[in-house]
């Protein structure tokens, strides 16, 4: 029993020993881990503490720290990334310089801590112990600098509004939430996004109800705190103060005012004495730069006095030992001053007052912030309101949809202004974006001063991406794919320290308007610097860019269009045209047209055509025609002719004709022609003609003709003719006759004739005739003729004729003819004609033609047409046929082929029918003569 107890006791003792070792080891590791965690969580504790001094120093730490890419939530990872950030500072000379500059810009009490952190980063590896040491010193400084709370709060304004880094495009909101859990210490990186506690600090710093504190004043006062001296402001003499500016100042167009001061220094002034220049609260001396500087007063290459800016924005100058050894010292100062957007938030008149002691100057100016840019329902404006050249950061504030219009699928993009050497870096690493919704557009300040606590932060509800190099995109939260309220976008970004360019940013707002048309509106921001002081404000100009392509989410509604294959058109045109053209064309055309035309034309044409034809003609015709015709023709022709003609004609004719014809003809002619034509014609004619003709003819013809004709004609004719003809004919006959005849005839004839003739005649005739005849004839004829003729003729005729005719004829004829003719004719004609025609034609033709024409015409046409078509419509403002009307004479002497219009060549048709009529007349004349000879 005792053995068992001992063994049990021994086992228990051993168990206790092992447990002690394990527990001790865990406690040791736990203590080490707690110290490490304490180092990384130290800033969180400071941020959440109730002490105002501690909160102030935390804010100052943010200002002094450089910016890195912390994205992690856990405290341990935060510490690790902090070390990495410090290591990168040591590796990157530019970033290292930034860290050192941040230390210089911090308050006097923070300088040793920041300097220590910088030394550690540069010279040795970063360890948790080093970080802890730095934070411990920071905690001690909190207790030592409780009196500096106001100054550090002022610096917080600069630090909270300094740019922070976002993580990646897809995780912006998550990163921003994470950033609120860890605020880096003084030697760590600045937070990626402003947390809730920092927002409170900003609200307190910029609250208009509290005394105004300026971010730039601390650095200047702390760095250049003057030694104890006497304020001799009221001892300065010969003080002169002026304000130079126009009557209107445009702050967003780099507008500013100049403050000028001049004075004499009393001989009693010594080193350390000071004087004060009061600056009105409506002005500041930094513009958009985060740190304001005032120019030192120089005496040659020696400094007479150095200036700093106090917390109220006034300037305090401290004399150097230069005044100890000088007398009758005078000085002049000129400083650029800028409209303060926090204290002047609206457009209006402002009275500016500045001075030295009791010597002041005042001036009332109009402050004009100008309206945002608007294009249709899109409105936007932006401004660059802060630049920190020490830390290479900037802040841009953009008003999106300040008009409060209805915009569908809104989006904002930001990028560099094209064709500029902008030094901005836009990417997920160097750009942080905050978005605020504005419920009432009246809450927007015209100066673009923004207090973030006054608006709803909707950054977590928007989609922020970086689709291209140096470009970001913000897609706004929408209700039914549209927005109706303004938004504020605050961009905190970085500047490339190696760039030689200036800041130049473009913001573009996209969206659909009420008509579902995709629109865009852009605004450009740049920075101007004055007097080398590093101060300035944005140069703003609205830009309406080239409208973008459709994004694809919403199809725009196409513009109304009506494409009716049937169209009605009415046109009234008056044109003068002169053309000289030569053409070689082959066309197959089928046309169906109905037209009513009224035209007056004067044409001058010279044509040379070869369809086996060579012609030279000059004609001058004046015609007025009104025609009404309906014809249905179907023709196929194959012709080969050889002709050499020289004609000059001048004709004046007036005709009124009404005809209806239905013809079907097929002809094949070859200088030997064999033609078969069937025609059914009905004509009624009433003609009155006076003719005086004188002709000399020498003809030799051989003809073999056989004709059968059955004709039926009704005619009423009245003619007066005076003819003089000389003819030389050889048909085995020689005749000379002079005749003067006056006849009145009324004839009614019915004839049915069938004739076959073969004739060969040579005739030489000389005749002169003067005839006056009145005839009224009515004839019905039915003729069938077959003729074979061979004729050689040489004729020269001059004719002057004027005729008025009204004819109506009905004819039914069938003829077969085989003719071979060679003709050489020279004719000159002068005709004046007037015609009234109304025609409707349906034609189907196949033609091969080679023509050359030269015509000059004046035409006035009035036409109404209705056509069924499916074609491209030429816009009303485009020139007819795609050419400019001013080029109507450019085609002169051109050898380009005429366009194929499908219309028949009326000149050629007239010439052909004229030749056929002449041939028929000749054959008829010869047959009658032969009949007379037989009798």
UniProtKB/Swiss-Prot annotation:
Q: Which InterPro entries match?
A: Adhesin_Fg-bd_dom_2 (IPR011266), Adhesion_dom_sf (IPR008966), Fibrogen-bd_dom1 (IPR011252), LPXTG_anchor (IPR019931), SDr-like (IPR050972), SDR_Ig (IPR041171), YSIRK_signal_dom (IPR005877)
- Residue list for modification Pentaglycyl murein peptidoglycan amidated threonine: 901
Which source organism does the UniProt entry give?
Answer: Staphylococcus aureus (strain Mu50 / ATCC 700699)
Which parts of this protein are propeptide? 902-935
Could you tell me where this protein is found in the cell?
A: Secreted, Cell wall
User: Annotated motif LPXTG sorting signal: location in the chain?
Assistant: 898-902
Membrane-crossing ranges are: none
Protein name (database record): Clumping factor A
